[in-house]
Amino acid sequence: MAGLYLLGGRQRKLLLKGEEEWNLYEAALILHLDTGSGKVRTCVEYKSPLEARASENSSMVFKSGTLVGNTLYACTSTELMIFKLPEFERVGYISLPCFNDVHHVTPTCDGNFLVASTGLDMVFKFDGAGKVLNEWSVLEEEPWSRFSRTVDYRKVESTKPHTSHPNFVFELEDEVWVTRFRQRDAICLNKPGKKIDIRVERPHDGLVCGERIYFTTVDGRIVVADRGTRRVSAVFDLKEMSDPNSLLGWCRGLLPVDERRIWVGFTRVRKTQFKENVLWIRSVFRDGMASKPTHIALYDIAERRCLRECNLEAHGINIIFGIFPDSLS
């Protein structure tokens, strides 16, 4: 079985009581996991420069990215980075004032980039020089109606609570799509009116794979939509395939191995002050439940069972956003 690249971050060792999410993580990490031997090595440990973060204590985490061939497009909350694998040579870097709580970046079919700037409830398209080519609000409002073009939002620690919280942007032919956490759907931005209704829970990640579009929901489900019909065709509840006495965690990051096996990432649940982020926990938590550590798990969705797990906290990752294949291993 091939190796995996894991994107996330390491939590600070000394935390103040009530520390907010945007101050929790001291370094963005990319690890390589040999799924055969279980060996883990660090490929990238990164801290954003001061000009690209709000304060010295701002969290630094690699969020969700995109792997095309041997090129990895990764992002922090305020930056896009391009790496050539397997050496992880950094060959590109863009940071723009409109980047706030960026959750996902992907290259476009015309050679540009799309970013979900989650903190602004917007999606931006820009070229390799950082010139913004298009911008969309993910809500029924004009872009910038709630924010200012003159503010450098890299210097704003947080804009929470978010009205929508877009987190995964993707293309289907000539259409630009994005998932919306609060609205439980994915919508087409450049052809308004088209929508994939995710409904069962709030989505937080996705992947277009052949004729299937996979989405994770925060409570631990995989939602599969048909690329042709843009309709949900299957829902797999990973909680039903796992230890019923354990709280799986925030479900973010997925990688199909084949039509039946899929890797999924889970981040340990921690307390948060934002009501919208704990509703799903209240719906599944029962007395006696233990919160599982940050981990990845391999599921057989055909037999509906968990095949194996890997604890990531032992290797320094406390939050995980992305899982990508090492095609050379």
Q: What role is predicted for each listed range?
A:
Residues 205-297:
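Loop/turn-rich, solvent-exposed surfaces of beta-rich toroidal or solenoidal domains
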